[in-house]
């Protein structure tokens, strides 16, 4: 998974407020696109097609599995255990 180098520094202001960024809702849209809402009230659409590589993420290229995404306590996850850090999702 490619993570932007400035990810941590960009998320610090939110952490300074005593809050940890997390996903509160997810909706499957089409292909590998998801509509996400975060606990800071910001939402948007992420396209994860280019992020589906590696042992945990390759199975998600099967759209029937990708569509089974759900929200955990902080982020999104799939039945095979694959997940993305909420900070990463917020930045893409």
Regions found by a protein language model. Give the residues of each.
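Motif-centric detector for short Cys/His coordination patterns
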Residues: 1-92
């Amino acid at each position: 998974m490619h993570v932007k180098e400035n990810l941590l520094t960009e998320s610090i202001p939110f952490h300074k407020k005593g809050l940890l960024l997390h996903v509160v809702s997810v909706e499957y849209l089409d292909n590998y696109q998801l509509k996400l809402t975060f606990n800071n009230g910001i939402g948007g659409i992420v396209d994860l097609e280019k992020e589906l590589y590696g042992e945990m993420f390759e199975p998600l290229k099967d759209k029937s599995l990708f569509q089974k995404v759900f929200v955990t306590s902080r982020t999104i996850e799939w039945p095979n255990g694959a997940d993305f850090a909420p900070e990463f999702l917020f930045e893409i």
